[in-house]
């Protein structure tokens, strides 16, 4: 499986990160948007 991380995500308030997990056929298994506001 593959893990794709986009960090930092811009144009939002706070600090954001996107994590996408792909299976062996490059299909999305799980995706998360993490936002931490200060």
From Swiss-Prot:
Q: What is its main location?
A: cytoplasm
Subcellular location per UniProt equals:
Cytoplasm
Q: Which reaction does it catalyse?
A: H2 + NAD(+) = NADH + H(+)
Q: Listed GO molecular functions?
A: hydrogen dehydrogenase activity; metal ion binding
Q: Which UniProt keywords apply?
A: Cytoplasm, Metal-binding, NAD, Nickel, Oxidoreductase, Plasmid
| A GO cellular-component term linked to this record | cytoplasm
Q: What is its EC number?
A: 1.12.1.2
Q: Which family does it belong to?
A: Belongs to the [NiFe]/[NiFeSe] hydrogenase large subunit family.
**Would you tell me the protein name for this molecule?**
NAD-reducing hydrogenase HoxS subunit beta
Gene that this sequence comes from = hoxH
